[in-house]
Amino acid sequence: MPQGPDTYESMTALYADPENVEGITYGKRWLRHEWSQIVEEQPTDNFEIQTIVMAIHGGGIEAGTSEIALAAAGYHPATLAPSTDGYGLHNFWLFEGLLTSGNGDLHVTASHYDEPIATELVENSRRCLSLHGCRDSQAHGVIQLGGLDHELRDIVLEELEAAGIAAEITTNPMLDGNLPDNIANKTRIGGCAQLEIGTNDRRLLFGINTRPQRKNTTNERFWRLVGALRKSMSRV
């Protein structure tokens, strides 16, 4: 999370800046499992197809969120090998800063996140798990939970606590993800579960906390967090 106001007021503005080049400045990764474009024809009993995991500030923007999101969706962050843990494979969206420094300039707040592919993915999903990073002074060593999908949010809290991970439902309006315009709340049920994880808490998930090596050095703490998130999504 940047210290000051965003450089760009929207993703449209970010993409319009010729200084930003896909594959150099930023990257986009997403996966959508097969479903009908017609909402009424989408299956209602397949939690995998119905759920999307997002890291809208991935890569170097809010470091570590890409890796968490991929693993929570069921794909190993280093190899993209699908999980066989029995908790399914989910759709995902990642927008990743690729700069060696200054990735905070690519942060567009969730309520101004008018990315067309991401919007389509969310609007055609029933549930959303959204991963964010915040400052240590905001999190105080405790994962901050929010979003308008209170059922999933509360299940995430329960599973995190069962895994021995400190978490709480935040009352900070900068972190609570409760704006209806938050892209992650634009699901078919009008809500998401949002996690805000402090800088140091994200750093502790990896043996080597650099963009090239995070995916290769995930540790027990990382997989404990991911396991709790995957169990949570299987319960809704």
Label every model-predicted segment.
Residues 1-236:
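N-terminal catalytic or cofactor-binding beta/alpha core of small enzyme domains
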